[in-house]
Amino acid sequence: MKKGINRVVLVGTGAVGCSYAYSMINQGVAEEFVLVDVNEAKAEGEAMDLSHAVPFSPSPTKVWSGSYADCKDADLVVITAGLPQKPGETRLDLVEKNTKIFKQIVRGIMDSGFDGIFLIATNPVDILTYVTWKESGLPKERVIGSGTTLDSARFRYMLGDYLDVDPRNVHAYIVGEHGDTELPVWSHATIGVQKLETILANNEQYKQEDLDKIFENVRDAAYQVIERKGATYYGIGMSLLRVTKAILNNENSVLTVSAYLEGQYGEKDAYVGVPAVINREGVREIVELELNEDEKAKFAHSVKVLKETMAPVL
């Protein structure tokens, strides 16, 4: 890392990577931003285009297309490269294809002398974050996946819409796999300072079956978007930006990232979406929510599915 200069390297300039890159320039988060892609011309073109937006950014950012060698002085490497999810394909269906790609990418990055933090977004994100941790040899705290940050954002947006409340005042989490086995933590959902269950008990117009439908829409949101426009990228781009800001600004923010469990929630040796405190060192600590029995069972099932899917590719 270069003292006093925040450098972020993005590996993968597809739709997700470029949405993240645009968000980064739009908010002026890093002083140096490097784009790397197997398609060098694409990375170069994106860097040129982004550079032309810098005069409108809140703060200047030096943007260029580079190579894995640029990772040597990076504080953060964000990986969005990999094969995208096709219509009808689950995130877990991608595991074998993207694991092979990822191992090559991580080795190339580590050969540069990189000693910063990894942030992974490629699906299946929990498994590929684990693969990155194993391949890199970095401390578990410095390998993070986007986890259920986007799912939690979708959850808060839809709950806010249903209750007619600013989603920024909705405090609710989706945990587990970023995918079909994820689960809502209803027992800890609050609107402002009031428990969601209290609001339901005191207002006849709000019903649990409506909330259950909201969760189904959260869980299946990616499928719905992919069916209509081919891919999701704005939401995950902003999610990655949020985690990036928490890291570079040493915020100690609580975000539902994919973090390594070693006994928390009764699970170990798995990366999975849970609330965690994020700062300049990566994951400072995991926030262990007291789940009810139903939530515990669903969380255990989610981790079990991840481990079973991951086993053949490790």
Curated annotation (Swiss-Prot):
Binding residues annotated for substrate, in chain numbering: Q85, R91, N123, P124, V125, D126, D151, S152, A153, R154, T232
Phosphotyrosine: residues bearing it: Y223
Catalytic reaction(s) noted: (S)-lactate + NAD(+) = pyruvate + NADH + H(+)
Catalytic residue list: H178
InterPro entries in alphabetical order: L-lactate/malate_DH (IPR001557), L-lactate_DH (IPR011304), L-lactate_DH_AS (IPR018177), Lactate/malate_DH_C (IPR022383), Lactate/malate_DH_N (IPR001236), Lactate_DH/Glyco_Ohase_4_C (IPR015955), NAD(P)-bd_dom_sf (IPR036291)
Annotated signal sequence range: none
Keywords: Allosteric enzyme, Cytoplasm, NAD, Oxidoreductase, Phosphoprotein
GO cellular component: cytoplasm
EC number: 1.1.1.27
Positions annotated to bind NAD(+): V16, D37, K42, Y68, G82, L83, A121, T122, N123, S146
Pathway, per record: Fermentation; pyruvate fermentation to lactate; (S)-lactate from pyruvate: step 1/1
Biological processes per GO annotation: glycolytic process; lactate metabolic process; pyruvate metabolic process
Chief site of localization: cytoplasm
Residues noted as binding beta-D-fructose 1,6-bisphosphate in the record, renumbered to the chain: R156, H171
One Pfam assignment: Ldh_1_C
Alphabetized GO MF terms: L-lactate dehydrogenase activity
UniProt entry tagged with the keyword rRNA processing: no
Activity regulation summary: Allosterically activated by fructose 1,6-bisphosphate (FBP).
Subcellular location(s) per record: Cytoplasm
Protein family according to the UniProt entry: Belongs to the LDH/MDH superfamily. LDH family.
Purpose: Catalyzes the conversion of lactate to pyruvate.
Subunit-structure text: Homotetramer.
UniProt-recorded name of the protein: L-lactate dehydrogenase 2
Source lineage: Bacteria, Bacillati, Bacillota, Bacilli, Bacillales
